[in-house]
Amino acid sequence: MSHNTFGHLFRVTTFGESHGVALGCVVDGCPPGLALEAEEIQAELDRRKPGQSRFTTQRREPDQVKILSGVFGDDRTGGRQLTTGTPIALMIENTDQRSKDYSEIRDSYRPGHADYTYDAKYGFRDYRGGGRSSARETAARVAAGAIARKVIPGITIRAALVQMGPHAIDRANWDWAEVGNNPFFCPDAKAAALYESYLDGIRKDGSSVGAVIEVIAEGVPPGLGAPIYGKLDADLAAAMMSINAVKGVEIGDGFAAAALRGEDNADEMRAGNDGRPRFLGNHAGGILGGISSGEPIVVRFAVKPTSSILTPRQSVNRQGEEIDLVTKGRHDPCVGIRAVPVAEAMMACVLADHHLRHRGQVGDRV
């Protein structure tokens, strides 16, 4: 299986399966001399790890990260661990696999999952928990994202769940401080209360629901990205689409821009106090012509409902026989919840990569 590496200069390669011994990543291209401790990576992983509320999978994984290479410290660094510029290898052991839950479906194709397509491509697959196609793989991305943030210290990246099922937040109530106060990473306290009762009903039905996640990067300087095939927004779209269960991505106003007139969509400019243009709006989501404008970068993506549900579903098996299938195992009733820290990580990886590419092409000019 190829295509396990993301990025050009800041390169992230992930490895591992849902029920394997461990998963992890190798980060190549991280500059030397950056302070990096396992605790900083762990803090990000703790936001994503399962089993923290009744609204996520009850699989209990501590997701303890181990740094295997790429950092070093001694008396000259004051005991701090600094990146050496060599590949940084991270490992997260799996400790709570329950593979027996999947023995009955090893020859069956679960509707909505990648079982059939993996079989069609490779002729062989790890059916335990979805193997490589499981969202468990995203733990490695979150770990890599913690390193990426070190490369772009002046940029703030935050994400939130802004819609669950048909219920969108009231943007007038947006408060970033609320994101850490509820299990949904929701910036609207009233919406979070609604989501609690709504998702309880979904769980009791043995069903699932989708979500919309919004991720915003502030402090991005103008100039990141390149025309045509190196567009920043193209790489961001690819990064978000690579997250499990994501079915659509938009930047700025996205699809809503199709309903606007030209004078409503184009962000007007005036002279700023720093000599640069000051934008009067941000319909473009911080990117023009594939290059960052200096405005906040705004990306949203849609996450489909978790395909593993208790309702019997029609399917077929490897022998071509028609079957009715009930999926067992432990699953998220809304996989979009834990996609929030994953979205931040992918934004960080893309921006770190483009920061290094920009510096390599034009120096430190911003």
UniProtKB/Swiss-Prot annotation:
NADP(+) binds at residues 48, 54. Reduced FMN (FMNH(2)). One of its GO terms (biological process) is chorismate biosynthetic process. CDD domains: Chorismate_synthase. FMN binds at residues 132-134, 244-245, 289, 304-308, 330. Transmembrane segments: none annotated. Pfam families: Chorismate_synt. One of its GO terms (molecular function) is FMN binding. Its cofactor is FMNH2. This reaction introduces a second double bond into the aromatic ring system. Homotetramer. Belongs to the chorismate synthase family. This is Chorismate synthase. It comes from Methylorubrum populi (strain ATCC BAA-705 / NCIMB 13946 / BJ001) (Methylobacterium populi).
